[in-house]
UniProtKB/Swiss-Prot annotation:
Gene: recR
Source species taxonomy: Bacteria, Pseudomonadati, Campylobacterota, Epsilonproteobacteria, Campylobacterales
Protein name: Recombination protein RecR
MF GO annotations: DNA binding; zinc ion binding
Native source species: Helicobacter pylori (strain G27)
One of the GO biological process terms: DNA recombination
HAMAP family, per the entry: RecR
SUPFAM superfamilies: Recombination protein RecR (SSF111304)
Length: 193
């Protein structure tokens, strides 16, 4: 016997796809699918177009690995930013969060994963940009502490100052779950790593 739900394959497929977005549960996915499919199909078309454009144009900056729509991102090509400081973050989304604070005027380097770090290119960048300080803007975890020590060891011959953002950022919490005041305070109170 066919049920009503079985006859709505396309709608249920949309719900299933939306549910795969982080932090979106089945009820929220259903509400979004219903809204986009029935109440506001124009918005659905706008979202589709925006997704196509983003997928077609987004790439990573060849210098810092942040999101960009060109070979080199706006931050790396901005001559007015301080070259002496390089802020290392784990994910491209962390650059968005820190930039919103407007507390850091230096450059960034997005790690993504330690396996992907091109230390030769990073070392070249340290020399060319005359970087004096590396700021680790990582959420505090034992794994991230180990990562900082590893990077410090790999770059010790450059006699850099290594700092990390101060505690106050709860252990095990991602940046997007921290209020901007706490994150700003932690960033401005960074300590030697």
């Amino acid at each position: 016997m066919n049920t009503y739900k079985n006859s709505l394959n396309h709608f249920l497929n949309l719900v299933d796809c939306l549910e795969k977005i982080p932090n979106v549960g089945k009820k929220s996915a259903f509400k979004m699918a219903y809204h986009l499919g029935l109440e506001n199909p124009y918005l659905a078309l706008k979202i589709t177009h925006a997704l196509e454009n983003a997928l077609e144009n987004l790439k990573t900056c060849s210098s810092c690995n942040a999101l960009s729509e060109s070979e080199v991102c706006e931050i790396c090509s901005d001559e007015s930013r301080q070259n002496s400081q390089l802020c290392m973050v784990l994910h491209p989304r962390d650059v968005f969060i820190l930039e919103d604070l407007k507390d850091f005027l230096g450059r960034y380097y997005v790690l993504n994963s330690i396996e992907e770090v091109d230390f030769n290119a990073l070392e070249k960048r340290l020399i060319e940009e005359n970087i004096k300080e590396i700021i680790f803007a990582f959420p505090p975890t034992l794994a991230n502490d180990s990562l900082m020590l590893y990077i410090e060891d790999k770059l010790q011959r450059f006699h850099l100052t290594f700092t990390k953002i101060a505690q106050g950022v709860p252990t095990g919490v991602n940046f997007e779950n921290i209020d901007s005041v706490s994150l700003s305070r932690a960033f401005n109170s960074r300590i030697k790593a």
